[in-house]
UniProtKB/Swiss-Prot annotation:
Biological classification of the source: Viruses, Duplodnaviria, Heunggongvirae, Uroviricota, Caudoviricetes
Protein name as annotated: Regulatory protein cox
InterPro entries: Cox_sf, Phage_P2_Cox
Residue stretches spanning the membrane: none
Keywords, comma-separated and alphabetical: DNA-binding, Early protein, Repressor, Transcription, Transcription regulation
One Pfam family here: Phage_Cox
A molecular function GO annotation: DNA binding
Family: To phage HP1 cox.
Keyword DNA-binding recorded: yes
Family matches, as Gene3D superfamilies: Regulatory phage protein Cox (6.10.200.10)
Gene that this polypeptide is encoded by: cox
Species per Swiss-Prot/TrEMBL record: Escherichia phage P2 (Bacteriophage P2)
């Protein structure tokens, strides 16, 4: 049986997100720097700069983006895997 990931929060540190998607923390940090991830920049009200230096990935936005990307694919590509299960329509 495969493992199921259950999270009790909508945001996780980018280092944990890297583990979830099988990428290095450096790769995920570069994705953040290029604006490719929905992140929350944690702030420290006690700090002079206001920045805590922590990025957390907002999972609902990530999941919505993946769903949109998947559903935007052409039907024959998006549903092609169903053919292998005998559930898709023949081309």
């Amino acid at each position: 049986m495969s493992k199921q990931v259950t999270l009790m929060t909508d945001a996780i540190p980018y280092q944990e997100f890297a583990k979830l998607i099988g990428k290095s923390t450096g790769a995920v940090r570069r994705m953040i720097d290029k604006g490719k991830l929905p992140v929350i920049d944690m702030t420290d009200p006690q700090s002079a700069s206001g920045r805590a230096g922590e990025y957390w990935v907002y999972l609902p936005a990530w999941n919505n983006g993946l769903k949109l990307a998947y559903e935007s694919r052409p039907k024959e590509i998006r549903d092609g895997w169903l053919m292998w299960l005998g559930l898709g329509e023949p081309r």
